[in-house]
Amino acid sequence: MQQNALLQQLLADNDLSSAEMEACITAIMTGGFSDIAIAAILALLQKKGVKATELSGAYRAMMTHAIPIELDEHAVDTCGTGGDHAGTFNVSTVAAIIANGAGVSIAKHGNRSVTSRCGSADVLEALGYTIDLSPEATMELFSKTRFAFLFAPLYHPSMKAVAHIRRELGIRTIFNTLGPLANPACVKRQVIGVYDPSIMELYIETLMKTGCRHAMVVHGKTESGAPLDESSVCGITHISELHEGVVSYHSVIPEEFGLSRWKTADLKGGDREDNAMIIRRILDGSASQAQIDASIYAAAMACYVSGKATCIDEGLCLCKESLENGDAAKNFSRILDLNREIADKHRTAVN
């Protein structure tokens, strides 16, 4: 579709077909449109509201231009959309670490901070993890640990073409929505936290179209009813679940799983060093019970979608055990050691 025809369609608030959106995103990432047109397209799409058919087309375009990596069909990604401005510590990151200690393969796709003070890449780096390993080095690490962090800029180089436009626009765009879906390992199992409950159905419908096997899209509430882009130990958590093509809906509270209810202030994070310290304390057992509960709650959901647990309750038991017997801490220490060793080896080979 030509640039002007596309703009006219979006100005009229008309939805694009999946193929039209795929062509649109491809043109955006390959220099087919001017910067001014790209800014207009992104803003108009955001105003109109992206539909699942459009998002699946955008997903195909983005994955076509991604650097792929083959890991494990059972690997799980835990991530959030951001945007809740709650200032909590990196719950989805420590949840991935705990779940991995419980035997779950993890392929966490992440980036530096966008809407918070500390993104998953930031906190892992502060913990001593080299985040920009090559795909080959990452595959080697994963083969030994069943843990991989996939640094988004490394696997989606075509996004550089629009980075300056997104920065100047200063608004959320379709690329923010795409982020949690665009794992370069093409994972089929995910826990996605969303700050806006109105997009839960969008994600579920798109995950169905992209071949996901088991996913939970979660939206939490604080004690005051404010949004959280993760499961909540402060209030209710709404869940849209996709499992082998079947969609179901649940609303749960922490007490159902034997967890206490906490205040958002109990989960506050800080900068990368602050959040790294919180994660260390969670792993060594010296963190607050609120921090531990929030972490194992999220980790339990990862265990469930991985197939390691048959329900969230069972996942919670596995994650508690992973923390209490020290498996999560020992396992992550080994990951850091091997990450350092592999990074040094590949750096030496390049030099």
UniProtKB/Swiss-Prot annotation:
Cofactor needs: Mg(2+)
Residues annotated for 5-phospho-alpha-D-ribose 1-diphosphate binding in this entry: 80, 83-84, 88, 90-93, 108-116, 120
Binding sites annotated in the UniProt record for anthranilate 2: 166
Keyword ATP-binding found: no
EC number: 2.4.2.18
Pathway(s) this gene product operates in, as recorded in its UniProt entry: Amino-acid biosynthesis; L-tryptophan biosynthesis; L-tryptophan from chorismate: step 2/5
Recorded GO MF terms: anthranilate phosphoribosyltransferase activity; magnesium ion binding
Any one of the GO CC terms: cytosol
SUPFAM superfamilies: Nucleoside phosphorylase/phosphoribosyltransferase catalytic domain, Nucleoside phosphorylase/phosphoribosyltransferase N-terminal domain
Positions with a binding annotation for Mg(2+) 2: 229-230
Catalysed conversion reaction: N-(5-phospho-beta-D-ribosyl)anthranilate + diphosphate = 5-phospho-alpha-D-ribose 1-diphosphate + anthranilate
Residues the record lists as binding Mg(2+) 1: 92, 230
UniProt KW keywords: Amino-acid biosynthesis, Aromatic amino acid biosynthesis, Glycosyltransferase, Magnesium, Metal-binding, Transferase, Tryptophan biosynthesis
Family (UniProt): Belongs to the anthranilate phosphoribosyltransferase family.
PANTHER family, alphabetized: ANTHRANILATE PHOSPHORIBOSYLTRANSFERASE
Subunit structure: Homodimer.
Protein name as catalogued: Anthranilate phosphoribosyltransferase
Origin species: Prosthecochloris aestuarii (strain DSM 271 / SK 413)
Gene behind the chain: trpD
